[in-house]
Amino acid sequence: MESYGRKRAWKKGPTRGKGGPQNAACEYRGVRQRTWGKWVAEIREPNKRTRLWLGSFATAEEAALAYDEAARRLYGPDAFLNLPHLRAASAAAAHQRLRWLPASAAAAAARGGAAAVPAYGLLNLNAQHNVHVIHQRLQELKNSSSSPTKPPPRTPTRANPPPPPLPTSSPCSTVTNSVGSAALPPPMSCFQALEQAMAATAAMESAPCDDDAAVVGFGADKPQLDLKEFLQQIGVLKADDDGATGKNGAVHGDDGELADAFGFGGSGEFDWDALAADMSDIAGGHGGALGANGGFQMDDLHEVEQFGGCMPIPIWDI
């Protein structure tokens, strides 16, 4: 029973190896450090296992003073204190809380008007470090607003001119933009060029073609000849008053032997095989050979000069 009345031995509050970097070196009771550097204070109620939160502080000494004040209220004059010699300093700091109040509220409190003092003036500012910082910042802003300073004059800065546009190129067309050049059409992509070409081709195919008009790009400067006129020019067929040429190139005459001799059958159609056989016979009689394309191959230039006036020109070479 005698040991029951004794005071408990001094024990360090925060757990070793946890909390902030200075938590293990702290010797204050009920004070521990967070991992991000803040100091907090807690105290256990008498005969209970619950703990009371005292607040967060910037330094370990402020947290220790908060614990000492709570211990005096809960345990009386026999409570364990972290900083017993700083009790007078903490009491003096309590009188300095009025400096955070407005001037009108402080004057009313000095005259005895307790009702004019706002409720936030009774807060424990020492236990709330963030409130200290807020009040200091508000005071600095108030002082700066009362004496405004002129901002330094801005020097005009010349903006750099934009770089000249780079030449744009595409797989189908290349357009170079230069200063002072005439307005050029926008570049055309490959797909647009292909669509325009297909549209032009479709328009040409859909347009009605004239039999007498020459096809553009193919034989435009060569006149269209009839088969009879062609044979007469090369000397194979002589002009005959009795014969006539129809629209489809068929030879009609009184004498059918002349038509059969030059490859025209009874139906009026030209027989190319018969013409090739006749040309082979002519070539064999004159000592020439028929080439691969139906042309004559002469042995020397004298034969070319001799038969040049009457030799037929192969129509496959035209």
From Swiss-Prot:
Show the ranges annotated as biased composition (Basic residues). Answer: 1-15
Q: Which residues form the signal peptide?
A: none
Presence of keyword Calcium: no
The UniProt regions of compositional bias labelled Pro residues, in chain numbering, are 149-168
GO cellular component terms, alphabetically, are: nucleus
Predominant location of this chain?
A: nucleus
Where, subcellularly, is it found? Nucleus
Which sequence positions fall in the DNA-binding region?
27-84
Instruction: Give the residue ranges for region: Disordered.
Output: 1-24, 140-178
CDD domains hit by this protein: AP2 (cd00018)
Instruction: Give the induction annotation.
Output: Not induced by high-salt and drought stresses.
Q: Which Pfam families match?
A: AP2
Gene3D superfamilies to which the protein is assigned, alphabetical: AP2/ERF domain
| A GO BP annotation | response to stress
Keywords noted in UniProt:
Activator, DNA-binding, Nucleus, Stress response, Transcription, Transcription regulation
Which molecular-function annotation in GO is an example for this chain?
A: transcription cis-regulatory region binding
Q: Which PANTHER family match?
A: DEHYDRATION-RESPONSIVE ELEMENT-BINDING PROTEIN 2C, DEHYDRATION-RESPONSIVE ELEMENT-BINDING PROTEIN 2F
User: Which family does the record assign?
Assistant: Belongs to the AP2/ERF transcription factor family. ERF subfamily.
Please give the function described in this protein's UniProt entry: Probable transcriptional activator that binds to the DNA sequence 5'-[AG]CCGAC-3' of the cis-acting dehydration-responsive element (DRE).
Q: What is this protein called?
A: Dehydration-responsive element-binding protein 2E
